[in-house]
Amino acid sequence: MSEQTANKETRGFQSEVKQLLHLMIHSLYSNKEIFLRELISNASDASDKLRFKALSNGDLYEGNADLGVKLSFNEAANTLTISDNGIGMSREDVIEHLGTIAKSGTADFFSKLSEDQSKDSQLIGQFGVGFYSAFIVADAVTVRTRAAGSEKDQGVQWHSEGEGDYTIEDITKESRGTDIILHMREEGKEFLNEWRLKEVIGKYSDHIGIPVSIWTVEKDEEGKDKEGKWEQVNKAQALWTRSKSDIEDAEYQEFYKHVSHDFADPLTWSHNKVEGKNDYTSLLYIPAKAPFDMMNRDHKSGLKLYVQRVFIMDDAEQFMPTYLRFVKGLIDSNDLPLNVSREILQDNKVTQSLRSACTKRVLGMLEKMAKKDDEKYLTFWKQFGQVLKEGLAEDLANKEKIAGLLRFATTEKDSSEQALGLAGYVERMKEEQDKIFYLTADSYAAAKNSPHLEQFKAKGIEVVLMYDRIDEWLMSYLTEFDGKQFQSITKAGLDLSKFEDEAEKEKHKETEEEFKSVVERTKSYLGDRVKEVRTTFKLATTPAVVVTDDFEMGTQMAKLLEAAGQAAPEVKYIFEINPDHALVKQMADEADEEAFGRWVEMLLGQAMLAERGSLEDPSQFLSAMNQLLAK
């Protein structure tokens, strides 16, 4: 919807923008100074983009290549102005960037908002508020802008009071770039002060690679204003170009917020200058919290790319594998050409070398964190563990390293916390144990209560419990660790005989022989509904279970395919009965074939329910159970 008069029109905000403006004003007021960080960061990005475009078209500088950000305020008019002489915007750019949120996962973001202001403020921080943060301190915002290389009469003015609409009109603007004029609310007037502005710039924008200046007016001896001048406030040296020993942790943390637009401090970072075959500097951060849309395949990820300190592009995903898409930061290469494009990056030897080095650097950071600060690593794992698991299929060269970083729950602790690494499991293995036992299930509750665990608990053998959706797929790539094979305890090939003494083995052999006719009778009744029927001694309190062949698709994988809308091959189960269980003994003693069949239906139904959580024909199961109960 829009009304237009000559070159001026009033347009309605995209509905998500209205919602975001309302949320920011009410959720971020306690941290209102971040508006300045966001607006200066945007101005810095605009300068980076101009510098990049001017590589192929020097006329865009319009005779002025000295880039910078300038702040001035007018107490009488109650305004604060943030100006840059960067790339600027056309009318179409203004409508696209200031009237809509062109982000993947926007609907998902809004669906996760609550009425809890502290939680919402964290989520908004992850989403990245950018320009809209101006409305935290201003009740009206005017933007005057002109795109570099356009005529002076092609400037654009945008104005909004942060309600449902905004106006846009053509203006004449002498200089390229953007002026953002904030008409301050009462609670924003503290920023109409030179010292307050200097404090905030020093805190948030010292690392910006271009000058950030304030218009200052000194007083003479009589208290009258002298002629004003621009005073540079920040160091204006790109942080990653400085020596590590000269950079405080607080500076690294603020730079992270600049590149990520996150509100929280990162968990850790790595700053490295490498000289040799490839000359480059990398500054890589691991966030403390996962972005709301991390599992969305359209989620923008990748590093900022600079070549010889000149900004080239955002979200250069070629330098980081997909399973490390949560990593933020930048890479500054001396070896790539300044006119590099995404297409050139794709098949470039330098790119491949830098990608390999950055991947090893991140995995090294994680290994160091896991060894030195277990609590911090578990914080990382809770946020990013499921994504890291993807690396087992994606990055065969680093498979062993990634496997060492995995964390799982086990039967050793009555807790769903995924806290044990595979190296820790191997250390605790029984002397005669040569395999890593694991179980996959839909949930922690289903895993810890699985009947398949009964003998393991009785013999004190630890089992890894896997219940993330990705885990069954994961295990098709993770076949061994530290020379130890993985063994699913729901597969037919499970052999626990080495944990039995000779007396147990002899007893089992005798029982197996005694139950031979019961097994044959059960198989005869079931026909081809099951692959095989056999006795098992791995159960204690459960009468029967179903298992799959070692090379047949497991239950969890079949369910995963079905959930994704793909056809899963029919799983043929092996039906295992516990000859020591009272119900199985009753079944064995039943002479009447019809009644025997009801026992088989009930025990198989129970086993299928425990394994799959559902039955193909529940009425048959209920009928058999009801008839047995009615006897």
UniProtKB/Swiss-Prot annotation:
CDD domains associated with the record: HATPase_Hsp90-like (cd16927)
GO cellular component terms given for this protein: cytoplasm
GO MF terms held by the record: ATP binding; ATP hydrolysis activity; ATP-dependent protein folding chaperone; unfolded protein binding
Top-level taxon: Bacteria
Region ranges (A): 1-342
UniProt-annotated stretches for the region C: 560-631
UniProt-annotated location(s): Cytoplasm
Family statement drawn from the similarity comment of this UniProt entry: Belongs to the heat shock protein 90 family.
Job description of the protein: Molecular chaperone. Has ATPase activity.
Assembly and binders: Homodimer.
Descriptive protein name: Chaperone protein HtpG
Species of origin: Aliivibrio fischeri (strain ATCC 700601 / ES114) (Vibrio fischeri)
